[in-house]
Amino acid sequence: MKHQMRILQGLKLAAVLAVALSMGACANKNLGAEGAMASAATPGSQQDFVVNVGDRVFFESDQTELSPQAIATLEKQAQWLQSYSRYSFTIEGHADERGTREYNIALGAKRAQSVKSFLSSRGIDPGRMRTISYGKERPVAVCNDISCWSQNRRAVTVLNASS
């Protein structure tokens, strides 16, 4: 009987150890989608720019003025673009769905120009930049709600293939 108890205790211990080891082996350092992308982004690549710097800034309704958050992102963009001068890029201006097509095209153009002016003031050669406005024609979120509208009021810096 004692022998069977020892065997049973040994089996329990072995089972606990097996579970613990298997859990430890499966415990990868889950970085999440962004962390995994950031660690996989090659420095100086388009993915590096998007993931580690940020390719877009957002605006308040009917505004072209850069917010403190937008300025922080654009400061990082300027540093990155100084380091990787082989890229030319396009600044896309966007607006939410409210307002006329004409109004939103003009607003998107002013937003793109605000970003271009900021980057120029930080030493980025204006010859590397192009601006375009899509107005409300290319929303990233579609719904009749402020949560969607705020995502669509943006300027996106799109890198062109390096030469």
Question: What is each residue range found by the language model?
Answer:
Residues 2-15:
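Bacterial N-terminal signal peptides that target proteins for export
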Residues 147-151:
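A generic structural micro-feature
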Residues 85-94, 109-140, 153-163:
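A non-catalytic structural micro-motif
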Residues 69, 73-76, 102, 110, ...:
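Extracytoplasmic/secreted proteins, especially bacterial periplasmic and envelope-associated proteins
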